[in-house]
C-alpha cells in the first residue's frame, strides 16, 4: 500500500511544494492544507506505481509519469476548478518542451 505522511512542521517538503510522491518508498507527503489538485496529482502517481510496480515505475521517464497523471486529471477534470486545470495544462506543456 501507500503511506500518506503529513508534513506538519514543514520540514520535509520545500516551501514551494504542497505535495510529493516518493516513488522509491511508495509514500505520499502532503503539507497541512494541500489543494485538491495536488492531492489527486500525487495520488495518480501512487496509483500508477501500484498498477505497474515499483521497478517498472522507476524505469519510466519523468515525462512518461507526468503524462499519466495529466491524462488522469483530464479524465477527472470535473473534480477541479478552472485554475487547477489551466495550471495542469501549463505544467505538462512545460515538461513536454523540456523532455521531448
Identify the meaning behind each predicted range.
Residues 1-100:
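Catalytic toxin/effector domains delivered as secreted proteins or via bacterial secretion systems
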Amino acid at each position: 500500500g501507500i503511506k500518506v505522511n503529513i508534513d506538519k512542521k514543514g520540514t520535509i517538503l520545500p516551501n514551494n511544494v504542497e505535495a510529493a510522491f516518493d516513488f522509491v518508498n511508495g509514500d505520499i507527503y502532503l503539507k497541512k492544507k494541500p489543494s485538491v489538485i495536488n492531492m489527486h496529482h500525487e495520488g495518480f502517481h501512487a496509483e500508477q506505481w501500484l498498477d505497474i510496480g515499483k521497478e517498472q515505475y522507476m524505469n519510466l521517464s519523468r515525462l512518461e509519469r507526468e503524462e499519466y497523471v495529466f491524462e488522469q486529471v483530464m479524465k477527472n477534470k470535473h473534480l477541479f476548478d478552472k485554475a487547477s486545470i489551466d495550471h495542469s495544462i501549463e505544467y505538462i506543456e512545460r515538461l513536454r518542451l523540456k523532455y521531448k
